[in-house]
Curated annotation (Swiss-Prot):
Keywords: Aminoacyl-tRNA synthetase, ATP-binding, Cytoplasm, Ligase, Magnesium, Metal-binding, Nucleotide-binding, Protein biosynthesis. It is an enzyme of class 6 (ligase). Tetramer of two alpha and two beta subunits. The lineage of its organism: Bacteria, Bacillati, Bacillota, Clostridia, Eubacteriales. Its main location: cytoplasm. Its cofactor is Mg(2+). Binds 2 magnesium ions per tetramer. Its EC number is 6.1.1.20. It comes from Syntrophomonas wolfei subsp. wolfei (strain DSM 2245B / Goettingen). Gene3D superfamilies: Bira Bifunctional Protein, Domain 2. Belongs to the class-II aminoacyl-tRNA synthetase family. Phe-tRNA synthetase alpha subunit type 1 subfamily. This is Phenylalanine--tRNA ligase alpha subunit.
Length: 340
């Protein structure tokens, strides 16, 4: 029996030395120390030996079992250490490698031009006002001198939510809302940046776009004040070299009304494809506040006057940055946005 135990010991040690993975080690453990393993069967067979031989063989067999268990633990620890070293080696960081620069965020060009416009008018004493994008028909049309049967309603295709609610087609409703809150106090000097909605969608129109509305109410306000304000605005946005002109126009909420043009920023007024070879670019509409609108707002047109203007922010941005397709603003193309 002692010789058999020695043979099993030598054989197990030889096989264990050849084990090269955790899978092989687990297989070795089952074959030697498992329920039907060699050492387990050896220990079970001791019961058939005589007393003295059983004691000697039992001591040697138990030593073999303990030695094998110790060798298994050491082997397991060695494999775990090797596995850890391999993992650390794979995750090794070369601190001498150059760092990857972080990409910095940028303001959208429409955000940039909106803030620039706001800063210009705030510098002239204006404050920023806001209003709802889902607007009452009353404020969007009627209070701006556009009654239900007025032909000017045909000029704008609107997104109606119900008979009395729609997505505002311009930021002008905030004019009346502000006058209602302020009346009869004067002066009022506000600009209203915001989103507006119309049923247009092509290279120069979008169903959602941005406007900046302006309103000034006070005593003895004249068209000269309007011209001076907007000329200063044009020079600050497009440069002191641009020339400004006004053309008669029509808006229900202003009287008289005008369109303001600037000399073409692409050809400096010489005539090109952008300005249709006229040398001029339309940038906004303006006029003196219609007396009926003043009355809707709670003011006496015999006591106060005012002017208003409105411009498309996309239009200003396209002219300033030389962009020929409005849709580029809404496509979120990083190649386009990274230029600003």
């Amino acid at each position: 029996m002692l010789r058999k135990i020695e043979e099993i010991k030598n054989e197990c040690q030889a096989r264990l030395s050849q084990v090269s993975s955790m899978e092989e080690l687990n297989e070795f453990r089952i074959k030697t120390l498992g329920r039907k393993g060699e050492v387990t069967l050896l220990l079970r067979g001791l019961k058939d030996l005589s007393g003295e031989e059983k004691a000697r063989a039992g001591r040697v067999a138990n030593e073999l079992k303990q030695n094998l268990e110790q060798m298994l633990r050491e082997k397991i620890d060695a494999f775990k250490l090797d596995e850890l070293e391999q993992k650390l080696l794979q995750e090794k960081i070369d601190v001498t490698l150059p760092g990857l620069p972080r990409q910095r965020g940028r303001q959208h060009p429409l955000t940039q031009i909106t803030r620039e416009i706001q800063d210009i008018f705030i510098g002239m004493g204006f404050t920023v006002a806001e209003g709802p994008e889902i607007e009452l028909d009353y404020y969007n049309f009627e209070a701006l001198n556009v009654p239900r049967d007025h032909p000017a309603r045909d000029m704008q295709d609107s997104f109606y939510i119900s008979e009395e609610l729609l997505l505002r087609t311009h930021t002008s409703p905030v004019q009346v809302r502000t006058m209602e809150k302020m009346a009869p106090q004067i002066p009022i000097k506000i600009i209203v940046p915001g989103k507006v909605y119309r049923k247009d969608d092509d290279a120069t129109h979008s169903p959602m776009f941005h406007q900046v509305e302006g309103l000034v109410i006070g005593q003895r306000i004249t068209f000269a004040h309007l011209k001076g304000t907007l000329v200063r605005f044009a020079h600050q946005v497009f440069g002191e070299d641009v020339t400004v002109r006004y053309r008669p126009s029509f808006f229900p909420f202003t009287e008289p009304s005008a369109e303001m043009d600037i000399s073409c920023v692409m050809c400096q007024g010489e005539g090109c494809r952008v300005c249709s070879h006229t040398g001029w670019l339309e940038i906004l509409g303006a006029g003196m506040v219609n007396p009926r609108v003043l009355q809707y707002g709670g003011y006496d047109p015999e006591e106060v006057t005012g002017f208003a203007f409105g411009m498309g922010i996309e239009r200003i941005a396209m002219l300033k940055y030389g962009i020929n397709d409005l849709r580029l603003f809404f496509e979120n193309d990083k190649r386009f946005l990274a230029q600003f």
